[in-house]
Structures are given as C-alpha cells and as structure tokens.
Amino acid sequence: MIDILGDWKRSHFCGSITAADTGKEVCLMGWVQRRRDHGGLIFIDLRDRQGIAQLALDPDRDPEAHAKAERVRNEYVVAVRGIVSARPEGTVNPKMATGEVEVEVKELRMLNGAETPPFLIEDNVDVAENIRLKHRYLDLRRPALQSNLVLRHKVAQIVRNYLNDTGFIEVETPVLTKSTPEGARDYLVPSRVNPGMFYALPQSPQLFKQLLMVSGFDRYYQIVKCFRDEDLRADRQPEFTQIDCELSFVDRQDIMDIMEAMIATVFQQILGIELSLPMPRITYTESMARFGVDNPDMRFDLELVEISNIAKDCGFKVFADAVKKGGIVKLLNAKQCASFSRKEIDDLTDFVKIYGAKGLAYVKIQEDGSWQSPIAKFFTEKEIALIDEAAGSEPGDLLLFAADTFKVANESLGRLRGHLGQKLGLARKDDFRFAWVTDFPLLEWDGEARRHVAVHHPFTAPLDEDIALLDGDPGSARAKAYDLVLNGSEIGGGSIRIHNREIQNKMFSLMGITAEEAEEKFGFLLGALSYGAPPHGGIAFGLDRLMMILTGSDSIRDVIAFPKTQKATCLLSEAPGAVDDKQLRELSIRRAVRNN
C-alpha cells in the first residue's frame, strides 16, 4: 500500500548529514539504493541528488516502519523520520561522505513502488548505451551523470556571473529565423500561416548578435541552443549549447584577453586549477607546420617535420613525385616506437587512409643508428643523415612519413599524431593545455563548386594588411579569426566582423554570391551596415564540448541531460516521429518517397 506524503517536510538531503547532526531528528526522502536484512535489523541505503544515507530499522523501535521496510525494494521512493546517531564501532564507512552516521528510523512512509530496473543504478554498471538512453530517466539517477549535470549548472552560473560583472548584457535572439544556406544544413520548420514557406532553426545567433552591436548594446552574451543538420560523431549533437558573445569597439587581443580570463575563472572555481595567462598564441601557418592540424593537442611533443627539400631529388619515387606535383613530404618521429610490430604499423597505415593518405612509409632506427626500412635503399647516406638531423632521430625511434598534397599530408599525419598520443598514454585527461590559433585563411577554393568559400563564415573580417589582396589574390588573405583549442579540441571560435558594407559585398562577390542573392539572403544585415555599424567581434564556446573535457567524459552524451544518438534520434521519446496527414495538410506539405 502506498502512503501519502501528507504534511512531512524534508529537513536534510541524504548526502548532507554528518557527525555534527548526531542526536538531531531529521526527515529524509529519496530512492532505495539497496536493502539489507540482518536477521531482524534492516538497513536501507537511501539515495538522493546529494548522496546516500544509511537507515537502520529496528522492529523493537517501530514495528510498523520495520514491516514496511521488509516490503521495499530497489528504487522504491520512501520518506523517513528518525534520529541521527553515530555508527557502532567497526561499522564506519570511510568511502561515504555520511559514513560516520546512520539514521535510526522512527517512521517510514512508502511514497511509491518501482518495477525492477533494466540495469543497476550504479556508476560502473556494464550496460549497452542504447538501453541507458531508452531509460534515460533511470540513467540520470546515477551519481556520475547527476554530478556532470550539476557541474554543468555551476559552469553556466560562473560564466553568467563573470560576463555580468564584465559589462555584458544577456539578450535572447530568435529561434525561428531565416535559412541562409552557407555551411551546414539547416533544420527547417514549415510555416502554417505562410504556406510553402519555412523557418530555419539557428546554427548560431551570428547575424542577430551583430545587429545588437549595430543597435548599440556594446556587449552581449547568451547561453543558447543551436542546431545543425550534419553527420554526427562522438563529440557532436544535432542540437548543442553555445556560450555566445559579441563586443563592440574591440580588437582581437581584447576579446582573447577577456575570454581566456573567463575560462580561467571557470577552471579555478570548478577544478581549483590556476591557468597561466596569457594563453599561448600560434598562427594557423605555424600550427599546420608543427602539428598538421589547426586544433593541436599541446600535451605532448611529436611535432611534424617537413623534409620536402631533402626528398625532392631522392631516389624514392613516391616522395620525389609528390614534391614535383606541388605536394609536400612530412615525417613524425614516434620516439622509442621502433618495437612496433608489422601489424601495429599496418593499423597506423589504415588509420591515415581515413584522411586520404595513400600509404604510410616508415623507418625504424636501429641500435647502431642505421635505418631498417623497405625504403632505406632509395636514399643516399647524405640524405639519410639530413633526415635524421631534421627528425632528431635516436636509436629506437620510428619515423613515419606522408607524401601527398599539403592538405592530405598534414591532416593524415596530424590526426596520426593525436592517435599516437592516445595510444602511447601521452595525453592525460587531467592535463589541460590551451592555445589560441590565429590568422586563419579567410577563404579557400572549392574546386567542385568553382568558387571561394569562407573558412569560418562570410562575415569574418580580413586582416587590415590583407584587404588589398581581395582584389587580386583573395586566396592569400588572412582572417581576423581566432580559435581557442584545449587538448586537441576546439572549444571556442570567433572573429572580428566586417562592419563596412562595401567590404561585406566584396566578400559575398568572392564567394560567388550575386548582389541580388546577397540582398535576398542578407539584405537586413547589409541595411544595418549602412547605418553606422561599429567595429565589433565575438566568439562562441561549445558548452557541451567544454563540459566533456572538464568531466573527463568519453562521450558528449554524458554531459547532456537528454542527448540524441549518432543517428540524431532520441531513444527515450522516439523522436523524430511520423506525423499524421491532417497535420501535413495544414502545413501544405505532401509526402514524397525518397529513392535510395
């Protein structure tokens, strides 16, 4: 039989009682973690958001409460009244925050029963993720996930307090907006009152926050939900949360200074870690040269070395031909990895092929300093000496080579560097290394579309000294853009924006957007730029990805209350779902069968 709560009021959380409460009468409420019957005396571990308290039920003290306790099972919801007492000698549990005390129960109310859960409500439970996501309301009872979400709340509060104290104003921007098909695909929402027309869910509040700067708000922020209909991976979701900021009358340095201080405040208050400021700054060109990627993991060395000048005239045709075709040859020195088996090297070769590399040449440095490799015979002693010097080769090292286009050689070896960092245990989760990456290319050439595309977005300003390049050599122009990278993940990215209508029109033109198209898609922005737009810039941080790193989680789904799968489905609510024909008719939509 289920009891009613009645006039009972909780006095303490389960995890908050301590030895200082000994002798006090308390009222606790929560879920039964486990029940143990010791031949008359029954012990219940009662759990809530803050922890676990041990309850002791003695039939001599309250027969009715004891009788109810005999019927409770795991995950039953109960409320108890009792006296906090010190645990008997020898029964103290140092692993529990409440391990010095227990509650001698005088009254118990059984507030609800529970079916047997499909998995134990424990942190180290071994259960398939799809089962956990299907029963997310049970999964979220586990202390680790609750801790992650409580920490997420604290981070959001710290960010808000910092930005409020730094002169920012929180402003909400529209969720139903206009589709601007640059970048990832939009999620579209049909308009019932405007048949045949669609809203788009925002990929970011980009244009609206720029308009707020034109409006004179000076400093804006928002912790905002954004949406992208893109292929997913471990650290991406179709809906995600950004810490979004925009500032007027600033340069890049101002924004980086303010934002790294915000991140330092988060790390100090959450982890007790004092970050060294200013954070390192490297250019995109330097990052690609040293690490092969624009989001380098700075926790370990393994830097890449270009040897194109040595390889261009060597006898190994793969290397020489790559350079002659305008490509590059780079190597990575995996220190003391010459013991890798052929299978391990084959696995590394398969890994780089994911990123377009055709293969992976290797050299093992023997104890006498000589090369052991299928390609050794193609190199002269002088070339070998030059490569060893460039690589810093030592006996026991493994040299790994990529010869391809600039993009493929860098990305394949750069990703391999990150992979080896994990494989060799060089990337500790409790080691936090930041870097600002700056001076990205403004544009890149899309060979398939036969036009330039923005590396970041079309509203990014070029460096002042590169504005002239827009007329003759736009591919060489650099952007006033900056990304904040933490342990190989981009956690934030932004730029100084174009605030001059003429330059914005030029940018659209370089991207193959006609004046008519620009007016149709972005006329409201261009109009605003005609009415005294101030110099401005901003940044957005991925809160989900930041939380993933702060908590040491392997999946972004562990820091989001109700996440989607990698197929963008919600196993709990079974979204997305079908809608009936009546709803579709109201929206002037007709079903079409897709031919796969």
Swiss-Prot record:
From the UniProt record, give one GO term of the biological process aspect: aspartyl-tRNA aminoacylation
Cite the binding residues for L-aspartate: E182, R228, H456, R497
Q: What is its EC number?
A: 6.1.1.23
GO terms of molecular function: aspartate-tRNA ligase activity; aspartate-tRNA(Asn) ligase activity; ATP binding; nucleic acid binding
Keyword Cytoplasm found: yes
- Any transmembrane segments, and where? none
Q: Tell whether RNA-binding is among the UniProt keywords.
A: no
Query: Kind of enzyme, top EC level?
Result: ligase
Locations listed in the record: Cytoplasm
Q: Where is this region: Aspartate?
A: 206-209
Give residues annotated as binding ATP: R228, D229, E230, Q237, E490, G542, L543, D544, R545
Under CDD domains, the record lists: AspRS_core, EcAspRS_like_N
Q: What does the similarity note say?
A: Belongs to the class-II aminoacyl-tRNA synthetase family. Type 1 subfamily.
**What does this protein's UniProt record list under function?**
Aspartyl-tRNA synthetase with relaxed tRNA specificity since it is able to aspartylate not only its cognate tRNA(Asp) but also tRNA(Asn). Reaction proceeds in two steps: L-aspartate is first activated by ATP to form Asp-AMP and then transferred to the acceptor end of tRNA(Asp/Asn).
Q: Which protein is depicted?
A: Aspartate--tRNA(Asp/Asn) ligase
To which species is this protein native?
Answer: Syntrophotalea carbinolica (strain DSM 2380 / NBRC 103641 / GraBd1)
